[in-house]
Curated annotation (Swiss-Prot):
Protein name in the entry: UPF0235 protein Mvan_2846
InterPro entries assigned: DUF167, YggU-like_sf
Gene3D superfamilies, sorted: YggU-like (3.30.1200.10)
Cited SUPFAM superfamilies: YggU-like (SSF69786)
Pfam family, one: DUF167
Family: Belongs to the UPF0235 family.
Species of provenance: Mycolicibacterium vanbaalenii (strain DSM 7251 / JCM 13017 / BCRC 16820 / KCTC 9966 / NRRL B-24157 / PYR-1) (Mycobacterium vanbaalenii)
Length: 75
């Protein structure tokens, strides 16, 4: 069973790597990597896999590759 989650990404953050859940349930992921050559996306996948306790291979970017709001399939 897989879930799709919407994530707001903050690349180049000194605060990361960190996952915060807002009052509306939206996830915000802070990563240190800049949004260059897919490095921030790879970092977000790594952070989400750790957050949800699944292997990185089970986290897939399904939408928003070049946007700050992205959709990921987990599981």
């Amino acid at each position: 069973m897989s879930d799709v989650v919407s994530v707001r990404v903050k690349p180049g953050s000194k605060k990361g790597p960190l996952v915060e859940t807002g009052p509306d349930g939206e996830l915000t992921v802070y990563v240190r990597e800049r949004a260059v050559d897919g490095k921030a996306n790879a970092a977000v996948i790594r952070v989400l896999a750790e957050h949800f306790g699944v292997p990185r291979s089970l986290v897939e970017l399904t939408g928003g590759a070049s946007s700050r709001i992205k959709r990921f399939r987990i599981g």
